[in-house]
Amino acid sequence: MLISRPVPISNHLCFVRKFVSISCAALALIVELAAAPRGAYARATPQFEALPLVRSRQNHLLVRAFINGKPAWLTVDSGAPVSVIALNRREYFRLKPTTAESKLPARVQINGAFNSVVIARELRIGGLTLVDEPVVTVDLGYSTRAARHVHEQEIDGIIGADILFPTQAVLDCERQLLILKTDPEVMGRVPGFDRRGLRAVPIQVSDDYNLYVNGSVNGKPAKLMVDTGSFATLLHRSFVRRMRIATRETQFSSSAVNLKERGVRVALIRKLSVGSVDIFGKEVGVIDLEGLIHDGLLEPRDGGAPVAGLLGAETLRRHHGIIDFGTRTLYLR
């Protein structure tokens, strides 16, 4: 997992991007998390629970949680395959290492560095209580410094796809709500979910639990990763160059764990399409995503469209984005 330091863009707020690359060992952890029974539940009703989220000045959506009885602020991040806890909070939350009986790896390699897998005896999010929940400890120092820079609450960790998919979560980016299924036996969709006026965009889920949607940039077919952990929509520098789209330099740069600092430019996209939703005159960040999106997805292959960048929180909020992890659908207006 990689986290960029704060980089102001056009509105002078900060964004923090957590870029994730997972080795085979980490992928094994994701498979274990997806297949494992999802712990115990604090109460049988309601079968679904809508939790209010707090939007940080870095444009992240935060939910209040309790880890082993201690309060925590966790970022809800659709771009994170696994849930993580800040390394410097491991002792505070009394997280324990994995055991041989658990059949989980003790460490996973993420972008060339090893991170420990630990167990939270109890992770409570609203009425949902997960017992003996595996999480990865990661240095979130970049995020911590970003929070201090804008004088706001530091985050304790991240809720990733390993929790969002099994609970068939619905994340409403505009209304700032996280809806979780607290009873895994309940069938059917989230009640009271109004889709009127919204357009459905199918989500493709990769083997390492990243979410992609089809779209286009100035008419050129491209895929975008749906990433609420990215403050703004960001396009890959090489893709923008191939499209001969003009960019302008900024004084800002982005750094990430185990990667060199990278400059950030800004481009004006004439037409950005996500599914059947067209966005005209869209200003986006431009950054080198090499090493952050892997498996050759940044380059077109076998006639398929490349991954051009990240569909970030600012765009999702402005266009009433709703991510339905149960049906694997993104709704936009």
Spans of features found by a protein language model:
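Residue-level detector of alpha-helical transmembrane segments in integral membrane proteins
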Residues: M1-I3, I30, G39
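Sequence-pattern detector for short linear motifs
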Residues: P8, V20-S21, Y92
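Bacterial N-terminal signal peptides
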Residues: S21-E32
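Pepsin/retropepsin-fold aspartyl endopeptidases
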Residues: L33-R333
